[in-house]
């Protein structure tokens, strides 16, 4: 969860917006007791919350690439002033929308996340933790929808 004071710049003809918040409060809450005891999502082990103060830059760009094909690019960058300033958390969503015909459309989305505070465990075949560190997380989605107008 983010709470901050900032300013937004919009370029309507390019469908581009840039939000800059030099004072942003970021909170991470882990309500699952097992996960909070493990220190998941960057919270201290046994704690349910983590709070940070930093800078947030958020951009969104919508673009029609060709007829019936559009792109949306959303990028969010955050850096904590107090802990490891300069380590940038990245949240990037890239979506392509395809209108196939009057009844069918498809979406392809990639979602990339990197947060230095989130440590991912890699285990060997015996279940022993071999490495613990920040990793790039990537999710891809393909959606196909049927359109119907009343």
Regions found by a protein language model. Give the residues of each.
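Outer-membrane beta-barrel translocator domains and adjoining extracellular loop/strand segments
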Residues: 30-37, 84-89, 119-126
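Outer-membrane pore/translocation modules
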Residues: 1-54, 128-137
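Outer-membrane beta-barrel "beta-signal"
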Residues: 136-150
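Repeated loop/turn-to-beta-strand initiation elements of outer-membrane beta-barrel proteins
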Residues: 14-18, 68-71, 103-108
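Surface-exposed extracellular loop regions of Gram-negative outer-membrane beta-barrel proteins
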Residues: 62-81
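Residues on the lipid-exposed face of transmembrane beta-strands in outer-membrane beta-barrel proteins
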Residues: 3-9, 22-24, 55-63, 77, ...
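Solvent-exposed loop/turn segments connecting transmembrane beta-strands
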Residues: 51, 80-89, 136-137
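Sequence/structural signature of outer-membrane beta-barrel proteins
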Residues: 26-30, 76-84, 113-119
């Amino acid at each position: 969860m983010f709470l901050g004071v900032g300013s937004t710049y919009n370029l309507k003809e390019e469908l581009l917006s840039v939000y800059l918040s030099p004072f942003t409060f970021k909170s991470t809450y882990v309500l699952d007791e097992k996960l909070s005891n493990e220190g998941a999502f960057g919270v201290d082990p046994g704690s349910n919350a983590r709070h940070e103060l930093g800078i947030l830059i958020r951009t969104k760009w919508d673009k029609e690439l060709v007829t019936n094909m559009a792109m949306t690019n959303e990028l969010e960058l955050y850096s904590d002033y107090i802990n490891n300033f300069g380590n940038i958390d990245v949240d990037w969503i890239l979506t392509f929308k395809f209108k196939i015909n009057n009844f069918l459309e498809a979406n392809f989305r990639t979602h990339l996340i990197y947060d230095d505070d989130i440590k991912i465990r890699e285990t060997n075949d015996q279940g022993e933790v071999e490495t613990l560190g920040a990793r790039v997380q990537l999710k891809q989605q393909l959606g196909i929808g049927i359109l119907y107008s009343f």
